Every structure is written in structure tokens, then in C-alpha cells.
């Protein structure tokens, strides 16, 4: 390279001419080379186009302060002299020709960059027939030489001198042995540095965050991006090619819409309808127009045939509702059809129709004969097992008595007492109990001691334990129905967002634990201040009553209005510490 160390003789260098070497070198990676001497920075500082320098996994302890060696005026003419140096950009990397001087003969040769590859060089002798003198136009004066200076003797930078690494933008010193912040500060002398990597060094191994001196001086003032952690490269997304042969082409058929089948509620309880009920129905049938009667007559035989074939249907599907005026006429038609079905001997009794009543949102068109036969057998068994009407009335009276004993706010919730949980329902369990169990297992590990006796240690004498009679636990008092309903309501609310903690334990925690639950600590302090203020107010009011002075009205607003959690306790304190009346004071 076109740089020399401190021990190089400056006088011998100034008497020679130099040419460009490695003019297009922009990236240099010297990883894992066991570099430890700071002079390697002085050797590389003359590379004028170097933009990226990587020195990872070496033994570098510090970055030295570099300053250009000042030579005579004739030799320091770096930017002037000749036509070719003016065409090249400022601070161009240059290299020297090597002259071999012997006592017998002097070989004149020149080191030039290759035409095919600019980063490589070739030696051209002057005696070679293809040697051209036009290459001498690239020869210029000596490039800058940098030396390492101690911090105490560091001078103010001269603007005429070339700075070290003028175009270096990326410097990586990861996996080295840098332990102090001062060892990295010379990076500020590199004018174009944008990014500095120094992770996995002793400087940042046991600390958190960027060191303060580097953050204030390099990052905030000079705008250098500091990287103290190893960046993980994102993984590329794997794209799976879609195969047309594996594509599902089946389509789900659309379900055709069918009119809903509505069941008319049956009000009659007797097996045989009375004559009083049949007479108004007959009158209604006579008043209806002839057109609708024909419609009903045409509808009835088809429905009766279908009812006989399919599970003895006791209903007739209603026609679509067209307007509000036709609603009443359709209701009367359905009522007449129900009564006609009841009077027909082919259909079952009212109790059978009650047992088969159910509400469906879909209409089944076809059913197998086996299912219909099973339904008929089940209906017959239910009719045989029906108890008499007397115990039903007793049960109803008992229910009325129990509901009358409960307060009014519990009416309608009596089913919760007799409700049985669904056996197929699995109660969801959160992750909190699992985490607590895991923490308990980690804090209390199971130690399996060896069964062999330890003869080296002091043996403890055997002391038999005293057997104590176990106390028979007293059964808890039986809860009333209101208490059971209150417990059910509390379980339904499930107040998981309320955290209970002793006030003294929260206030006397250490600083580290306070930072974890800072919100809880602030709320505890606020509650304590409110309690102290109310306590002082109560004490002052009691002292005024003792000494006969009238207590002043409270200046602070009611705390129960602003804080509902603490309001109940304050109301209780107000009622407990009320002012005594005149009759009490006289007595």
C-alpha cells in the first residue's frame, strides 16, 4: 500500500514518485486474522475509496488516533501537479513504484494496475518492448502517510491534511476485546462514517443499552448509528407451489327454502269437546266466504293422508302471510282445522297431541318407517307412565310456598337451584393456575435422597412423634336459599379484574417490586391518604363535641362519590362516628 509506518524514513520516500494502487477497492474484510496491533489501522488509513471495513473476530483492544505526517512542500503537493491527478477525484488512493537499486545494475520497473482487473497489479519493466511511456502520466507525488499519536500529544486537526479513511461508511469490530469507551472514540475522526458495529465485546457484554459517552458524542452529535446487538436476519418466506390436481372442486349444494311449519297451541284440557265450544266454531264456519271454505276442504284431505303416513301429524302448514287483513281469517282457518282433527276418530286424543307438540324451524319431508315406529312406541309408554293429577297439584302448591318465601328480586331465578350441569361441558381452565403450579415446582424441587445411611455425619436420635387425636370438623351451617342464590350470582359475575392485596405489604415493598406493580402502589398510597384525612376529620369532630364547640362543615367533598370502592367503608365510619344528639348528651 501507499502508506508507511513511523519507522519508515521520510527522506527516502520523498525522493521517489508513486502511482495509483487499488483505486476501486471499496470493501475489505479481514475477519478472523488475529490482528491485535493498532498499527493495522495506520496501514489501512490511506485507502481513499474504502467504504466498508470488517475486522470481526480479532484481538483488537483499541482504535488509535491517526494523523497525517507532514512532509516538505514539494512532496506534499497531493492535489496539484500534472494533468492526470486533477482528473482523479480528491483523496485518490495511490501506490508507489518499486525501484530495485543494486551496486552492479539498476532495474527500472513500474507497478501498474491491470487492465482486465483494476484491483490487481502487474509489474512492467522499462526494457520490455511493449512498455508505453503514456502510463507515466498517472504518476504523481507521495500520498499521505499516517502515524499513531498518543492522546496527550494529539494536536488540533489541520484542515490542509488528509483525514484517515475519508470515505469509510461502515466499520465492524464485533467479537473483539474492546473494554473501555475511550478506546472507541477515535472513530469520530473518520469523516464519512455512518454505521459502527461493536457487539460481543466486553464493553457491552454485561451492560444494558448503549454506553452513555458513545451515545452522547457519536450517536447524538455526529449521527453515527451504533449497533451493540447482533441483528438477526429475517428468514425468507417459503412459497409452496399450488398443484391444480389437489384443488378441491366440489361445491356444496344450496338448501332450498321451505315455509315454516307453525304449531297452534291447544287450550282444551278435556278429552271430548263441549257443545258450547262447538257452536261458536260452527257459526264462524258459516260466516266464512265460500271461496275459503273450498280452499280448506281441498287442503284437508291431502294433509290428513300425509298425517296418517308420517308420524300422525296434528298440524296443518299455514299459507304464506300476504297482508295484515288476512291474518285473522287464517287464524280462524287453522283453529277450525284443529277442531276438525280433534273430532275425527282417526287422530289421537288431546294428551297425545300435547306430548307430541314441539317447535321446529325446518320441515322434514320424508322419514324412515323404523323411526316412526319407535316414536309411536315411546308415546304409548309415556301415556302409560303418567301419574294422576293429585300429586301435580301438591307440587305446584309447594313451589308456590317456596317462591312466596323468597324476596321479590329472586323471582324467576329458582331454576338455578335445581339446574344440573351439563356432563358434556368442560369448564375452561386458564393458564394462571398452570403457571403458578410450574413456579411452585421450580421453587420446591423434589429431592430423592439416597437410602444409604450417612455414617460420616452426626446421627440424630430417634424421637417418636406424639399421636394427637384428630378433631372432628364442625359442619358449616346450612345456607338458606337466598344465600345460595347470592353465591350463584357472585360466581356468575366472576370478578377476575379485582385484585386483593394487604395494604401494608404493598406499601412496604422494595423499590424493585414497586416498579413491577407501580399502579397498585399508587392506588394504595391514595387510599391511605384518604383514610388519614377522614380519620383526622373524625378526630377533630369528636374533640369539638367534647369541648362543646360546634363542628365545622367538611370542606372536602364526599369521598364516596368519587371513589365507589372506598365509599362503603367511609359511609360506615360516618354512621359509626355521628354527632351525639341533645337527648344523649343530657342523659
UniProtKB/Swiss-Prot annotation:
Q: Which domain of life is it from?
A: Eukaryota
Subcellular localization, as worded in the UniProt entry: Cytoplasm; Nucleus
Sorted alphabetically, the Gene Ontology BP terms of this entry are: response to X-ray
Gene name, per UniProt, is XRRA1
* InterPro entries (UniProt xref): Leu-rich_rpt (IPR001611), LRR_dom_sf (IPR032675)
Q: What GO cellular component entries does it have? A: cytoplasm; nucleus
Coiled-coil features, chain-numbered ranges: 518-540
Q: Where is this region: Disordered?
A: 337-357, 373-396
* LRR-type repeats, residues: 24-45, 49-70
Record key words, sorted: Coiled coil, Cytoplasm, Leucine-rich repeat, Nucleus, Repeat
What name has this protein been given in UniProt? X-ray radiation resistance-associated protein 1
Tissue-specific expression: Expressed predominantly in testis.
Q: Which SUPFAM superfamilies match?
A: L domain-like
Task: Tell me, in a sentence or two, what this protein's role is.
Answer: May be involved in the response of cells to X-ray radiation.
Give the Basic and acidic residues compositional bias ranges: 344-355
Amino acid at each position: 500500500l501507499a502508506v508507511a509506518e513511523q519507522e519508515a524514513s521520510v527522506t527516502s520516500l520523498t525522493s521517489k514518485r508513486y502511482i495509483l494502487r487499488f483505486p476501486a477497492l471499496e470493501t475489505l474484510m479481514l475477519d478472523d486474522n488475529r490482528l491485535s496491533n493498532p498499527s493495522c489501522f495506520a496501514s489501512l488509513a490511506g485507502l481513499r475509496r474504502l467504504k466498508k471495513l470488517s475486522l470481526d473476530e480479532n484481538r483488537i483492544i483499541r482504535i488509535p488516533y491517526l494523523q497525517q505526517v507532514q512532509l516538505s512542500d514539494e512532496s506534499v503537493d497531493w492535489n496539484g501537479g500534472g494533468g492526470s491527478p486533477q482528473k482523479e477525484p480528491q483523496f485518490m488512493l495511490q501506490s508507489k513504484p518499486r525501484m530495485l537499486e543494486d551496486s552492479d545494475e539498476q532495474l527500472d520497473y513500474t507497478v501498474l494496475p491491470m487492465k482486465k482487473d483494476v484491483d490487481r497489479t502487474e509489474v512492467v519493466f522499462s526494457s520490455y518492448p511493449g512498455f508505453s511511456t503514456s502510463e507515466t502520466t498517472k504518476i504523481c507525488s507521495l500520498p499521505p502517510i499516517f502515524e499513531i499519536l498518543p492522546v496527550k500529544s494529539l494536536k488540533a486537526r489541520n484542515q490542509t491534511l488528509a483525514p484517515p479513511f475519508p470515505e469509510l461508511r461502515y466499520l465492524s469490530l464485533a467479537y473483539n476485546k474492546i473494554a473501555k469507551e475511550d478506546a472507541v472514540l477515535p472513530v469520530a475522526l473518520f469523516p464519512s462514517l455512518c454505521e459502527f458495529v461493536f457487539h460481543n465485546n466486553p464493553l457491552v457484554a454485561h451492560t444494558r443499552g448503549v454506553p452513555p459517552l458513545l451515545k452522547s458524542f457519536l450517536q447524538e452529535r455526529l449521527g453515527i448509528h451504533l449497533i451493540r446487538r447482533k441483528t438477526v436476519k429475517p428468514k425468507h418466506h417459503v412459497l409452496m407451489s399450488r398443484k391444480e390436481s389437489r384443488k378441491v372442486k366440489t361445491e356444496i349444494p344450496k338448501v332450498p327454502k321451505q315455509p315454516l311449519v307453525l304449531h297452534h297451541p291447544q287450550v282444551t284440557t278435556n278429552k271430548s269437546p263441549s257443545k258450547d265450544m262447538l257452536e261458536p266454531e260452527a257459526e264462524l264456519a258459516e260466516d266464512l266466504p265460500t271461496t275459503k271454505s273450498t280452499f280448506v276442504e281441498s287442503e284437508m284431505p291431502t294433509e290428513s293422508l300425509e298425517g296418517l303416513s308420517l308420524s300422525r301429524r296434528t298440524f296443518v302448514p299455514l299459507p304464506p302471510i300476504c297482508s295484515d287483513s288476512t291474518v285473522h281469517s287464517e287464524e280462524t282457518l287453522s283453529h277450525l282445522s284443529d277442531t276438525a282433527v280433534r273430532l275425527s276418530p282417526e287422530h289421537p286424543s288431546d294428551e297425545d297431541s300435547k306430548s307430541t307438540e314441539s317447535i321446529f324451524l325446518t320441515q322434514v319431508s320424508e322419514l324412515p318407517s323404523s323411526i316412526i315406529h319407535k316414536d309411536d312406541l315411546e308415546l304409548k309408554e309415556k301415556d302409560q307412565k303418567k301419574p294422576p293429577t293429585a300429586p301435580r297439584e301438591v307440587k305446584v302448591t309447594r313451589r308456590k310456598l317456596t317462591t312466596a318465601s323468597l324476596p321479590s328480586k329472586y323471582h324467576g331465578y329458582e331454576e338455578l337451584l335445581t339446574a344440573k350441569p351439563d356432563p358434556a361441558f368442560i369448564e375452561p381452565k386458564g393458564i394462571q393456575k398452570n403457571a403458578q403450579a410450574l413456579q411452585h415446582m421450580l421453587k420446591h424441587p423434589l429431592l430423592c435422597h439416597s437410602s444409604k445411611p450417612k455414617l460420616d455425619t452426626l446421627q440424630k436420635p430417634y424421637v417418636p412423634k406424639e399421636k394427637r387425636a384428630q378433631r372432628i370438623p364442625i359442619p358449616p351451617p346450612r345456607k338458606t336459599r337466598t344465600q345460595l342464590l347470592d353465591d350463584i350470582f357472585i360466581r356468575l359475575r366472576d370478578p377476575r379484574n379485582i385484585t386483593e392485596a394487604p395494604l401494608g405489604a404493598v406499601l412496604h415493598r422494595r423499590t424493585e417490586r414497586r416498579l413491577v406493580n407501580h399502579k397498585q402502589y399508587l392506588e394504595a398510597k391514595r387510599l391511605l391518604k384518604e383514610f388519614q384525612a377522614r380519620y383526622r376529620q373524625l378526630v377533630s369532630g369528636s374533640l369539638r363535641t367534647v369541648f362543646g364547640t360546634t363542628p365545622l362543615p367538611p370542606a372536602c367533598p364526599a369521598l364516596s362519590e368519587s371513589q365507589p370502592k372506598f365509599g362503603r367503608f367511609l359511609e360506615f365510619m360516618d354512621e359509626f362516628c355521628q354527632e351525639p344528639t341533645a337527648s344523649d348528651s343530657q342523659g
